[in-house]
Amino acid sequence: MREAVLVQMTWPGAPTIYYGDEAGVCGFTDPDNRRTYPWGKEDKELIQFHKDMIHVHKTCQELLTGSLKHVVSDYNVIGYGRFNKDAQTLVVVNNNDSPMIKEVSVWELGVPRECAMEQLILTTKDGFTTKKTQFPVVSGRIVINLPPKSGIVLRHVNKQQGKKFLHFE
């Protein structure tokens, strides 16, 4: 579920959350297409993940109006960049049952050939983190190592724009 939310909040267009998705409500087909909201039994971690991803979406201008470029395409793996003149965001999702390591060309997104990209969020099958981690970019490429059923959002802000921090509450 978190992988889908990660893509939804970083893909072009206005993300839509259908009633109860943020709390883990599921359904099938009509008339069981949407069950009642699970008051008192919500998936609080999933709600927090939605809040954090909405914060990323609203705070990163390149996610609102930036360009899109596919940078990774493999079986059950997708990677793309969202970018503008000020910042670049890289999104990679591994929907496989096994870990993956990919070397990704990020210079095509406008990321400098020698710098670092900052992890904004990492989701795995066991949970998620907003812990800031630096990923080195060497010769315009970055190495992404993802566990099974996971996704990551990395960001670089151009120096002339100053460092813009995302603060999670």
Question: What name fits each language-model region?
Answer:
Residues 22-25, 85-87, 95-98, 151, ...:
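Short, solvent-exposed loop/turn segments at secondary-structure junctions
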Residues 133-169:
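C-terminal beta-strand-rich structural cap/linker in extracellular carbohydrate-active enzymes
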